[in-house]
């Protein structure tokens, strides 16, 4: 039995000759009927599935990354997918966040910046020249580094009203978001 949502098309028009004026056309039956079993005259049913229209909106959250996407080599992506399965995470994003937490001591050693969750304000923390200057004032490279275990969580928070928009940072460097997308 066919479902009521199935659409069946029948080829009701016989094959057209190359010269239609040579053969008289006796009013063919072009009526559309409800879904019925194919007739014995050779018409074959064809099922057509309705196509889903592609969504134009991006389903992912935006962060302060100027609309950029992260492109990674295929081998790195394969390893992330494998780790996701091995660690039992539900998404690849969880795996990448886990990897960042594991690598945070090395990141702090390389960059000299970070914020502990106790010191972090409820809004997003700007990691920039002020953090580097504070780390340098605390004792240079040998000073106490501040830890950022939840850096991605800080990025996901909405910006404060008193923070400058990201466009000003792009214009200060001489590039625009359109230039970044073209690279």
UniProtKB/Swiss-Prot annotation:
Pfam family for this entry, one: TCP
Residue spans crossing the bilayer: none
Ranges where the TCP domain occurs: 56-110
Record's protein name: Transcription factor PCF1
Low complexity bias: start-end ranges: 167-183
Molecular function in Gene Ontology: DNA-binding transcription factor activity; sequence-specific DNA binding
Region (Disordered): 18-68, 157-183
Intracellular or extracellular location(s): Nucleus
UniProt cross-references to PROSITE patterns, sorted A to Z: TCP (PS51369)
Domain of life: Eukaryota
Lineage: Eukaryota, Viridiplantae, Streptophyta, Embryophyta, Tracheophyta
Assembly description: Forms homodimers and heterodimers with PCF2. Interacts with SPL14/IPA1.
Main location: nucleus
Organs and tissues of expression: Expressed in seedlings and leaves, mostly in the lower region rich in dividing cells.
An annotated GO cellular component: nucleus
Gene assigned in the entry: PCF1
Role according to the record: Transcription activator. Binds the promoter core sequence 5'-GGNCC-3', especially at sites IIa (5'-GGGCCCAC-3') and IIb (5'-GGTCCCAC-3') (essential for meristematic tissue-specificity expression) of the PCNA gene promoter. Can target the TCP motif 5'-TGGGCC/T-3'.
Keyword annotations: Activator, Developmental protein, DNA-binding, Nucleus, Transcription, Transcription regulation
């Amino acid at each position: 039995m066919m479902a009521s949502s199935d659409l069946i098309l029948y080829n009701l028009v016989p094959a057209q000759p190359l010269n239609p004026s040579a053969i008289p056309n006796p009013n063919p039956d072009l009526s559309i009927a409800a879904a019925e079993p194919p007739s014995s005259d050779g018409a074959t049913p064809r099922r057509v599935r309705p196509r889903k229209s592609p969504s134009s909106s991006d389903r992912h959250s935006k962060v302060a990354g100027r609309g950029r996407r992260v492109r990674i080599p295929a081998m790195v992506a394969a390893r992330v997918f494998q780790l996701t399965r091995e660690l039992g995470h539900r998404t690849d994003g969880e795996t990448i966040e886990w990897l960042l937490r594991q690598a945070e001591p090395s990141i702090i050693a390389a960059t000299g910046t970070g914020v502990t969750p106790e010191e972090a304000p409820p809004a997003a923390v700007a990691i920039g020249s002020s953090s580097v200057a504070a780390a340098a004032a605390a004792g240079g490279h040998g000073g106490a580094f501040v830890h950022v275990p939840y850096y991605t969580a800080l990025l996901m928070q909405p910006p404060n009203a008193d923070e400058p928009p990201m466009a000003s940072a792009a214009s200060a460097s001489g590039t625009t978001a359109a230039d970044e997308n073209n690279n």
